[in-house]
Amino acid sequence: MNQKSIVVFASGDLGAKLLHYVVKSGYKVKAVLTNKHSTAIIDFTKKIKLPIFIGNPNSDTGIGFIKNFNSEIMLSVNYIFLVKTNIFGSFDFPINIHGSLLPKYRGRTPHIWAIINNEKETGITSHFINEGCDEGDIIFQKNCPYWCF
C-alpha cells in the first residue's frame, strides 16, 4: 500500500510537538508551513532538511509553495492562519487538530475559554477542514481534564 504524503501547517509549541511526532513516527512529510515566531518548528524543519514556508499561506508566494507538493493530506495544528478554500480544497484529506471538544470553543485559544468558563474537562478534536472556522465534520474526539494542555 502506498503511504500518503502530508503537508503540515503548524504553529507554536503544540505544532512543534505534532511535527516531531509525525516525523518520528515515519510518516511522509513533504513540507511545513508556519509563522515567523514558531522558532522550534523552523529550527527542527531546517535540521531535518524539510522544505518550509514562513508566512501567510494565502499569499501568492504561499500558494506557489504549496503547489510544489502533490500531497494528499493537509494536517493543521495550532496554525495561526485561516486557510482559504483554494488551498485546503487541493488536498484529499484536509484535517485540523483542535484543542477543544467541538463544537465548543471554535477558533484560537479554546483552552483559555474552557478555564474562563470553569469547565471541568475539555478535550481534543480532529476534524475535516471546511470554509467555516473549526466547523468541519468531526473525525475523532478525546476528553481530558482542562489542565491536560
Task: Report each predicted region and the residues it spans.
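One-carbon transfer enzymes
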Residues: M1-F149
